[in-house]
Amino acid sequence: MTIQELAELLHGEIIGDPQTDIRGIEKIEYAEAGHIAFIANQKYLRYETQTLASALLISTSHTPQRTDIAYIRTEDPYDSFV
């Protein structure tokens, strides 16, 4: 699945490459290339610059800190994730 396809399902806004391939979901601290993770709690912001995830699901109020991964913005990343 691509970020584009996932963003359409979640009604989210894409930041980055819409063709980024996603093959799994993982917690941000354990994610690897091909995974998507989410940031729904401020305490996980520290992982944003360290994660190996290919994409992150973030809130509409969050400003992405990286340009090498894709992001999907939604109103509630946690609800979108589950």
Identify the function of each model-found stretch.
Residues 1-82:
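Terminal amphipathic alpha-helical/low-complexity segments used for targeting or macromolecular assembly
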